Amino acid sequence: MRIYFFIIVSIIYIFFQNFLFSNSNEIQNSNIPNKPNIFDKINDKDNLKDMILNISLYLENGGDINITDNEGNTLLMKSVSLGYYDLADYILTMSADISITNNNGENVLILSADYPYIINLLLNNIDNLDIADNEGKTALFHACEFGNLNSVKLLIKSGSDINKRDIFGKTILMYAVESENLELIKYLIEDIKVDINEKDDWGQNAIFFATKISVARYLIYKDIDYSATNSIGLKAYEVLKYNGYNNLSTYLRKLEKK
């Protein structure tokens, strides 16, 4: 009986010893600050001069201008994604490689899609404006997705392909419609003359992607086929209702009954 008691006590002792040792390690490790890296120096809190100075010191100490973070982004990528023109300009002068893509397949131009002034900076250094990310979206797609008319105009004027499609067959007009920027939509339809009734791989034209009645009304005014069915036989008002756009769905359904 004493032997069993001794064994049980020993097991309990070993268990608590391991438990306390494990927790002690966790507490010690939790108190060790993460080692700062150069990417931490590019943020939306510090001033621009300090960021440039920190990168300059980093490079003077043998740092790699094309180092990437866990997401595959370079220093240039992080700079442009935050809209820092002067910082991006400085990094470019340090012979940064603009051909690198991150884990999502995005390059610096794609990450600049919402900043036309940075796009303008990059245009002199980029030959191919139509590099696409893992979803098949070029910088022009992203600019349309942001609803940034100035970026879209600049990219198209510079030669971006307006006829490309993403991996789902979606067009730039569909992304513009999703952005809800009516001026952008008008520009693509009236000035660029994109085909308003083009369909994606699901057989859906741009009205399937509308979220506002004002956008749908304009598309209908420009003769979009709002009665078309997609590849599984659903009409736009049915898809929109499923997606929670009840007012727009009701608006289109009433038009169907006229």
Predicted regions and their residues:
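Ankyrin repeat A-helix N-terminal signature
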Residues: 44-50, 78-84, 111-116, 142-148, ...
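Classical Sec-dependent N-terminal signal peptides that target proteins to the secretory pathway
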Residues: 1-24
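Ankyrin-repeat and related helical/solenoid repeat scaffolds used for protein-protein interactions
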Residues: 194-234
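Ankyrin repeat domain, specifically the short helix-to-loop turn at the C-terminus of the second helix
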Residues: 56-63, 89-97, 121-128, 153-161, ...
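Leucine-rich solenoid repeat scaffolds
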Residues: 225-257
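Intrinsically disordered, low-complexity regulatory segments in ankyrin-centric signaling systems
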Residues: 21-61, 70-73, 81, 106
